[in-house]
C-alpha cells in the first residue's frame, strides 16, 4: 500500500444485471439516500425491461451465445463511468445493497492508498430477511443488527485498512479502484463468458502487476438472498469453458473446489490439479464417483 492520493470528487457506481429487478430497485433506493447525486451506471445484459427502467445511465449489452457476458458487461459499465468523468469506480453486484458508509469509506480509502483494489466486507442476508429502509446520512444504521460479514474474508474495524490481501479472495461483489488502476489492470478478461473465472483472473493480474488488495473496514454491503446450488451444477458448462481459459492464461486450474465437487457428482470429468483433463461428462457417463 503506497502513499496517499487526491480525494475522489466524482465517484461512480457500476452494476451489471440480468433480471433481479427487485434486488436492483433496493440497491438504487439505498444509493439515492446514502450517496445522493452519485452516478449509477447500470449495464443491462439481454434485458430490455431493465434497459427501459434505468433511464439515461443504462448501457445495453446483447446476449452472448455461450452465456451472460459478465466480464464484458463490467468493462462496458466502467468505460461509461470513466467517459462521464468518474475519478473512483465502485463495482457493486446487483444483489448487494450498500451500507450507509460504503461509498464514504471507499472514497476515504482511495485517498489513503495508491494502486489498490479496495474491497469492503459483504454480509449475506439469510432467506426471508427484509431489506430495511435506507437511513439518511448521519442517521442510525438500518443494517447494524444484520451485519455478519462473510467469514472467509477480512472485516476490519470501521475506518481501518488491511493491505496485503490474498489475491485469490478477490471478488467483484463490492470493490473500488481508480481509473488509473483500472487502466493498468486492463479490466476483466473478456474471454470469460458466463459463470466463473473472471474475478479470479483479475486477482491474479493485480498480483502480477503489484496492485495490492486492501480490505476496507466500514465499507459494508449486504447481499440479498437468492437460491443457489452448491456446487453450481447448472453452470457446469460455463465453469469448464472458463477454467480452460484460466489454465491457458496462468498454467493452473482455478475453482478447484467446484471442479472436485462437480467431478464427484459425475457432472464433469477432471483429472486433478496436474492433469490436462477437464470436460463435461458424456451422456450416460454420469453418476457419483
Feature-to-residue mapping (PLM):
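Short, well-formed alpha-helical segments that are part of the catalytic scaffolds
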Residues: 20-34
Amino acid at each position: 500500500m503506497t502513499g496517499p492520493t487526491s480525494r475522489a470528487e466524482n465517484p461512480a457506481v457500476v452494476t451489471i444485471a440480468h433480471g433481479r429487478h427487485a434486488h436492483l430497485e433496493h440497491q438504487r433506493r439505498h444509493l439515492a439516500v446514502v450517496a445522493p447525486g452519485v452516478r449509477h451506471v447500470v449495464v443491462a445484459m439481454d434485458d430490455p425491461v431493465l434497459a427501459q427502467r434505468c433511464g439515461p445511465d443504462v448501457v445495453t449489452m446483447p446476449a452472448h451465445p455461450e452465456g451472460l457476458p459478465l466480464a464484458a458487461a463490467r468493462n462496458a459499465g466502467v468505460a461509461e463511468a470513466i467517459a462521464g468523468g468518474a475519478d473512483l469506480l465502485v463495482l457493486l453486484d446487483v444483489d448487494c445493497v450498500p451500507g450507509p458508509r460504503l461509498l464514504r469509506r471507499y472514497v476515504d480509502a482511495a485517498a489513503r492508498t495508491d494502486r489498490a483494489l479496495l474491497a469492503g466486507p459483504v454480509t449475506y442476508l439469510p432467506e426471508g430477511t427484509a431489506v430495511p429502509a435506507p437511513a439518511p446520512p448521519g442517521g442510525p444504521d438500518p443494517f447494524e443488527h444484520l451485519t455478519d460479514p462473510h467469514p472467509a474474508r477480512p472485516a476490519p474495524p470501521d475506518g481501518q485498512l488491511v493491505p496485503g490481501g490474498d489475491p485469490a479472495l478477490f471478488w467483484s461483489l463490492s470493490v473500488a479502484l481508480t481509473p488509473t488502476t483500472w487502466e493498468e489492470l486492463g479490466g476483466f478478461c473478456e474471454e470469460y463468458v458466463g459463470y466463473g473465472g473472471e474475478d479470479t483472473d483479475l486477482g491474479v493480474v493485480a498480483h502480477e502487476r503489484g496492485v495490492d488488495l486492501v480490505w476496507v473496514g466500514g465499507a459494508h454491503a449486504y447481499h440479498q438472498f437468492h437460491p443457489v446450488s452448491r456446487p453450481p451444477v447448472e453452470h457446469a458448462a460455463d465453469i469448464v469453458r472458463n477454467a480452460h481459459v484460466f489454465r491457458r492464461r496462468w498454467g493452473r486450474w482455478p475453482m478447484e473446489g467446484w471442479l472436485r465437487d462437480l467431478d464427484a457428482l459425475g457432472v464433469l470429468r477432471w483429472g486433478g490439479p496436474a492433469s490436462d483433463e477437464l470436460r463435461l461428462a458424456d451422456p450416460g457417463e454420469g453418476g457419483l464417483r
